[in-house]
């Protein structure tokens, strides 16, 4: 039985951890995850999905604010694990920790060397990629730069957003890890170096990148909305206030960028730089998210054709 330390934070990571827990070949000695954080409007202190799963299985949990130089690091190394598996952990691993185990592998949600960094799924959708994937790679000090052990891909559909792709890629990553690890640990599967000259990066999105640019073609705006849903959520301005857009559909029509070019009781169509979008799920400032029908029957009733979003 291979003794593991697992490191991860969001639901993507929890799906991978669940697969390891269900496999008798692996003994999870402890789990390392990010500290509990304040979440939502009420700022409720919330455990990470990985912590919830670990506690349900009575596993020791470490939550260092920063792993390097911490007492938690010393405690983790004292466990004497054979290896480390990480998946969307959110911190760099100190070299001393990597050197203390026989192997350390990461489940990364991109087809490396493309989209190294913390937001690969967001960028894949925003950039209009036709596919996304996962890579099982060896951990090194440089971010997501280790040798690749295996990879797998699946298509990105127009109906997909960050949430749906996270769920799909978590399952793909879990299954690929469980398929890959035995051959990797036996030496039958040899890692392949990345072509570092082809590396691209997907840093965490800035607040400025959440704002929609209506001057872009409708397809690009459509991809941007999907690439921000369900977090951090794309927005524009309506009467000077933030107006979040969760979902939209490509539509016919033309007009000035951000201009409302059609309005009915059930639809609101906005022009982009080329083409248009019909908004379907929105969130006005200070309100919950709602279908466009509810918005148009309420505070959106005063909107008129010719009004402009983004101003």
UniProtKB/Swiss-Prot annotation:
<dbReference type="InterPro" id="IPR044135">
    <property type="entry name" value="Met-tRNA-FMT_C"/>
</dbReference>
<comment type="function">
    <text>Attaches a formyl group to the free amino group of methionyl-tRNA(fMet). The formyl group appears to play a dual role in the initiator identity of N-formylmethionyl-tRNA by promoting its recognition by IF2 and preventing the misappropriation of this tRNA by the elongation apparatus.</text>
</comment>
<feature type="binding site">
    <location>
        <begin position="110"/>
        <end position="113"/>
    </location>
    <ligand>
        <name>(6S)-5,6,7,8-tetrahydrofolate</name>
    </ligand>
</feature>
<dbReference type="InterPro" id="IPR005793">
    <property type="entry name" value="Formyl_trans_C"/>
</dbReference>
<dbReference type="Pfam" id="PF02911">
    <property type="entry name" value="Formyl_trans_C"/>
</dbReference>
<dbReference type="InterPro" id="IPR001555">
    <property type="entry name" value="GART_AS"/>
</dbReference>
<protein>
    <recommendedName>
        <fullName>Methionyl-tRNA formyltransferase</fullName>
        <ecNumber>2.1.2.9</ecNumber>
    </recommendedName>
</protein>
<comment type="similarity">
    <text>Belongs to the Fmt family.</text>
</comment>
<dbReference type="InterPro" id="IPR002376">
    <property type="entry name" value="Formyl_transf_N"/>
</dbReference>
<keyword id="KW-0808">Transferase</keyword>
<keyword id="KW-0648">Protein biosynthesis</keyword>
<dbReference type="GO" id="GO:0004479">
    <property type="term" value="F:methionyl-tRNA formyltransferase activity"/>
</dbReference>
<dbReference type="InterPro" id="IPR005794">
    <property type="entry name" value="Fmt"/>
</dbReference>
<dbReference type="InterPro" id="IPR037022">
    <property type="entry name" value="Formyl_trans_C_sf"/>
</dbReference>
<dbReference type="Pfam" id="PF00551">
    <property type="entry name" value="Formyl_trans_N"/>
</dbReference>
<dbReference type="InterPro" id="IPR011034">
    <property type="entry name" value="Formyl_transferase-like_C_sf"/>
</dbReference>
<dbReference type="GO" id="GO:0005829">
    <property type="term" value="C:cytosol"/>
</dbReference>
<dbReference type="InterPro" id="IPR036477">
    <property type="entry name" value="Formyl_transf_N_sf"/>
</dbReference>
<dbReference type="InterPro" id="IPR041711">
    <property type="entry name" value="Met-tRNA-FMT_N"/>
</dbReference>
């Amino acid at each position: 039985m291979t003794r593991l330390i697992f490191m991860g934070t969001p639901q993507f990571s929890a799906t991978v951890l669940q697969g390891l827990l269900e496999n008798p070949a692996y003994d999870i000695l402890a789990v390392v995850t990010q500290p509990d954080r304040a979440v939502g409007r009420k700022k409720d202190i919330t455990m990470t999905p990985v912590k919830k799963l670990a506690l349900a299985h009575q596993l020791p949990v470490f939550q260092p604010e920063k792993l390097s130089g911490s007492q938690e690091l010393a405690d983790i190394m004292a466990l004497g694990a054979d290896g480390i598996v990480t998946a969307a952990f959110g911190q760099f691993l100190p070299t001393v920790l990597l050197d203390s185990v026989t192997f350390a592998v990461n489940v990364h949600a991109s087809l490396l060397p493309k989209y190294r960094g913390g937001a690969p799924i967001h960028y894949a959708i925003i950039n209009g990629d036709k596919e996304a994937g996962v890579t099982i790679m060896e951990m090194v000090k440089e971010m997501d730069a280790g040798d690749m052990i295996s990879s797998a891909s699946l298509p990105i559909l127009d109906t997909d957003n960050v949430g749906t792709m996270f769920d799909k890629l978590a399952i793909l990553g879990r299954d690929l890890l469980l398929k890959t690890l035995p051959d990797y640990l036996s030496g039958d599967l040899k890692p392949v170096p990345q072509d570092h000259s082809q590396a691209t990066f997907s840093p965490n999105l800035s607040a400025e990148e959440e704002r929609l640019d209506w001057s872009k073609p409708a397809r690009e705006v459509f991809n941007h909305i999907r690439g921000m849903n369900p977090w951090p959520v794309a927005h524009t301005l309506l009467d000077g206030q933030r107006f979040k857009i969760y979902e939209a559909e490509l539509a016919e029509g033309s007009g000035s960028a951000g201009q409302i070019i059609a309005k009915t009781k059930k639809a609101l169509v906005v022009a982009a730089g080329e083409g248009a979008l019909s908004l379907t799920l929105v969130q006005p400032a200070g309100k919950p998210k709602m279908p466009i029908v509810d918005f148009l029957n309420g505070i959106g009733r005063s909107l008129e054709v010719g009004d402009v979003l983004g101003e």
